[in-house]
Amino acid sequence: MQELEQAVNRSVRVIPQGEGRVTIEKDLSSEEMILNMGPQHPSTHGVLRLECKTDGEVVTEAEPYLGYLHRCFEKHAEVVDYPGIVPFVDRMDYLAAMNSEFAYCIAVEKLLDVEIPRRVEFMRVIVSELNRIASHLVAIGTYAIDLGAFTPFLFCFRDREHIMSLLEWASGARMLYNYIWIGGASFDFPPGFKERTAEFVNYFRPKALELQRLLTENEIFVKRTKGIGMMPPDVAVNYGWSGPMLRGSGVEWDLRKHDPYSIYPELDFKVCVPDGKHSDIGDSLSRHLVRAYEMVESLSMIEQCLDKMPDANGFDPRSAIAKRIRPKAGEVYGRAENPRGELGFYIVSDGKSTKPVRCKARSSCFVNLSAMKELSMGQLIPDLVAIIGSIDIVLGEVDR
Amino acid sequence: MEESQGTIGQSAVVEASRAAYAIIREKFADAVSEFDANPTMPFFEILDTSRWSEIALFMRDNASLRFTYMACLSGMDYPEDAKLGIVCNLESLGEHGHRIAVKVKCDRDGGAIPSVANVWKTADWHEREAFDMYGMLFTGHPDLRRILCPEDWEGYPLRKDYEVQENYHGIKVPY
Amino acid sequence: MGLLDAKISNHNVLVTSVDNVLNWARLSSLWPMGFGLACCAIEMMATNASNYDLERFGIFPRSSPRQSDLMIVAGTVTMKMAERVIRLYEQMPEPRYVLSMGSCSNCGGPYWKHGYHVLKGVDRIIPVDVYVPGCPPRPEALIGGLMKVQELIRMEQIGISRAEALKKLEEKSFDPGIVLEHQRKSQAVS
């Protein structure tokens, strides 16, 4: 028997059946196949190419190839003056345009001697949190549709339309706003905006609960995302992860709390970290849960801002904006908490020109995606789709 | 934010960075430059580039420093000195809370900087991007090739003297 | 419905031309390969979703080029992506239409001057039938562009080339302002 076992190949198993009989089982021979997912693919959230080395259905390695949406943001930032960079910043992470503008303006304002009016600070936070909800809605909706659930996608986009009409009312555009300017904002809130926003907050609270019952507690969704794409917290920090990705691995780190900017120190909110009861900490379901909880936290933040905001009384949000933005010589790394993580701007100014010498955008999705190779080892191809969806990438920010 | 509160907050940050710098200076003496205590981004420069990965490992693993999180690694072009360089923003996330920036420079033509991709995995793709945009080499990088531009792109786009190529695979590039 | 020359006799026989039936069939179920690249893709998704529902026009997005007859190029085309766009266009079976959505695919958009890696307009590599301006175009604008594609399909005939159909579309196109003006005047009179 032993000689028989040793004499055969590793992929063949010899199972003794008693009475001197054996069953010989032979695996189908398999070899590694290189499969391309993308750049045009319904579930890669944009033009991302994943080169997967697969052994059957199991992926041994999936390497992302980027650059299909490289739109030369950093080159434009060196030839366009400081206020003119704001529309380009919008178009990087187009789902969270207000948050991106906020991060950029904070970075430049560190080099300027400008006092932002208090009402503008509240306006900025309200639109940023509204945009955070909108961005998470897209993240959740597209994640659901990747996994085959069509209805949550429609529900999310229906609710997102309300936010987009609010932001269109304030800024003039549905998606790429150019609203938060260096030193202020472009327009004040129109009369009635505060009341409509409060109406929206009351409308959306039960909808978030509905989404939770429809999707988050759905057995199929949980089975497809629980335990998939595990990332331990220290490896996550070493990769440079931030935002919901890092909080999904259990690290309590939110720039709004731990490196606060604007009026966030005055707001009362908690950092959403999964408790491990519904999901394994560090898997895709945890990251999804962080986003779902964050939407509800943003609602309470908006309510607090609406209460504390000073009244208009003929206020001009452009009052603190200088005619020529000429920051003093120096360099700064300014950052803010985007819905996808930490968006940072490393800006070098020479003090004489109205254009930056260097403006590097440290994008959250670029860094989050770099861990894809490690996360994908040993997963099945459908699980790969679940992992990409949980990373919530926006290729405009990855490729800039 | 109150003006005085802002400056107090800022100088506390600078002092924390200075304390961290002091530990590095003690160990590596002349391999690092003096501390630049500017209020917006305190930094120091690595003068002996060959020791950069050693210093990086020390910064990450030393118990009082614990710079576990690399926020950003940006490439830079210094045309007046004919040098290229990188600027790293490091932070001790959730532990000591201090942060610091490090600058490393190299020559423009054929210059090389040791790679820190094995110290902070963030640096892997950031160094590839710096190589793509500026052209400096990173010695010891596991996979140094262009990441954003196509593999056969000519030139290094973010250099100050970059000229766009006329044609790429038969397609006209300028407007 | 657009069956212009239909006459129904008492035996439920419809008399029309083959071109009309084919064109009606094609325009009522335009299946786009939504080639969503950047920000315009999100507006395209929003147009497909509940508020501006595109399904009521028969437009159902397909992922594969082999099963689609319209390619909506939504977003910036970069040099790296350009070759893939050509390949996808060639994979589409005829009759195929191309709608360029947004400034970036029309002419390079905000990146036209300094964007070294941006293709200045997707019409440099594939023939475009309809351009929809905007950055990003509103969903209503996209629906207007799709209706223009439907009008183009109405102009098609067996035996004429696409260029001739486009020319017919231009000639037949009119400024709706003239019709409205006329209506207003006639209402004012009466």
From Swiss-Prot, chain A:
Keyword NADP recorded = no
Which top EC class is named for this enzyme in its record? translocase
Which Pfam families does the UniProt entry name for this protein?
Answer: Complex1_49kDa
Q: Which InterPro entries match?
A: NADH_Q_OxRdtase_suD, NDH1_su_D/H, NiFe-Hase_large
Topological category with respect to the lipid bilayer: Peripheral membrane protein
Question: What is a single cellular component term in the Gene Ontology annotation?
Answer: plasma membrane
Its recorded reaction(s) are:
a quinone + NADH + 5 H(+)(in) = a quinol + NAD(+) + 4 H(+)(out)
- Please verify whether the record's keywords include Transport: yes
The protein's location, in the record's own words, is: Cell inner membrane
* Subunit structure, as described in the record: NDH-1 is composed of 14 different subunits. Subunits NuoB, C, D, E, F, and G constitute the peripheral sector of the complex.
What protein is this chain from? NADH-quinone oxidoreductase subunit D
Source organism of this protein record: Prosthecochloris aestuarii (strain DSM 271 / SK 413)
Gene expressing this chain = nuoD
From Swiss-Prot, chain C:
The superkingdom listed in its UniProt entry is Bacteria
What is its cofactor? [4Fe-4S] cluster
Is Transport found in the keyword set?
yes
Q: Give EC number(s), comma-separated.
A: 7.1.1.-
Q: Which InterPro entries match?
A: NADH_UbQ_OxRdtase-like_20kDa, NADH_UQ_OxRdtase_20Kd_su
Entry keywords, A to Z:
4Fe-4S, Cell inner membrane, Cell membrane, Iron, Iron-sulfur, Membrane, Metal-binding, NAD, Quinone, Translocase, Transport
Descriptive protein name:
NADH-quinone oxidoreductase subunit B
What is the membrane topology listed in the Swiss-Prot or TrEMBL record? Answer: Peripheral membrane protein
Query: PANTHER family under this entry?
Result: NADH DEHYDROGENASE, NADH-QUINONE OXIDOREDUCTASE SUBUNIT B 2
Annotated Gene Ontology cellular components are: plasma membrane; respiratory chain complex I
- Tell me where it mainly resides: membrane
The subunit field of the Swiss-Prot or TrEMBL record says: NDH-1 is composed of 14 different subunits. Subunits NuoB, C, D, E, F, and G constitute the peripheral sector of the complex.
Q: Does the keyword tRNA-binding apply?
A: no
Function comment: NDH-1 shuttles electrons from NADH, via FMN and iron-sulfur (Fe-S) centers, to quinones in the respiratory chain. The immediate electron acceptor for the enzyme in this species is believed to be a menaquinone. Couples the redox reaction to proton translocation (for every two electrons transferred, four hydrogen ions are translocated across the cytoplasmic membrane), and thus conserves the redox energy in a proton gradient.
Lineage of the native species?
Bacteria, Pseudomonadati, Chlorobiota, Chlorobiia, Chlorobiales
Q: Which reaction does it catalyse?
A: a quinone + NADH + 5 H(+)(in) = a quinol + NAD(+) + 4 H(+)(out)
GO MF term set: 4 iron, 4 sulfur cluster binding; iron ion binding; NADH dehydrogenase (ubiquinone) activity; NADH:ubiquinone reductase (non-electrogenic) activity; quinone binding
Enumerate the subcellular locations listed in this protein's record, separating them with semicolons: Cell inner membrane
Q: Which PROSITE patterns match?
A: COMPLEX1_20K (PS01150)
Cofactor binding note: Binds 1 [4Fe-4S] cluster.
